[in-house]
Amino acid sequence: MVRATNAVASHRRKKRLFKLAKGFVGDRKNHLRLTSGAVMRAMAYNYAHRKQKKRDFRSLWIMRLNAAARINGISYSKFIYGLKKAQCELDRKVLADMAIRDPGSFAAIVGFAKEALA
């Protein structure tokens, strides 16, 4: 009796794995055993860095806000505290974008925060 290998499913599985390994260099792109480990590791890094990206962007926004706030004569922490006291609902992403694209409006918001602190 002939041995059944289920060739269609195994070929599809390998094809899916090699498709995920597109762009890999050396044997990692076309040897099944090496490709499998490389793809698993890549997916693990992908998962971790999707979480890391959120932290990275928040720290970038804070750096930009700190620089822009200091140009307007106030520290970042006092600026955020003033906005909280003034019940301003703008988040750091919007504020950082405003600081870069529209410095005049950002200066007005800094003045708003300074008034709340006084």
Curated annotation (Swiss-Prot):
InterPro entries: Ribosomal_bL20, RIBOSOMAL_L20_CS, Ribosomal_protein_bL20_C. Gene3D superfamilies: 6.10.160.10, Ribosomal protein L20. Keywords: Ribonucleoprotein, Ribosomal protein, RNA-binding, rRNA-binding. Binds directly to 23S ribosomal RNA and is necessary for the in vitro assembly process of the 50S ribosomal subunit. It is not involved in the protein synthesizing functions of that subunit. This is Large ribosomal subunit protein bL20. GO terms for molecular function: rRNA binding; structural constituent of ribosome. Pfam families: Ribosomal_L20 (PF00453). Belongs to the bacterial ribosomal protein bL20 family. One of its GO terms (biological process) is translation. GO terms for cellular component: ribonucleoprotein complex; ribosome. Signal peptide: none annotated. NCBIfam families: rplT_bact.
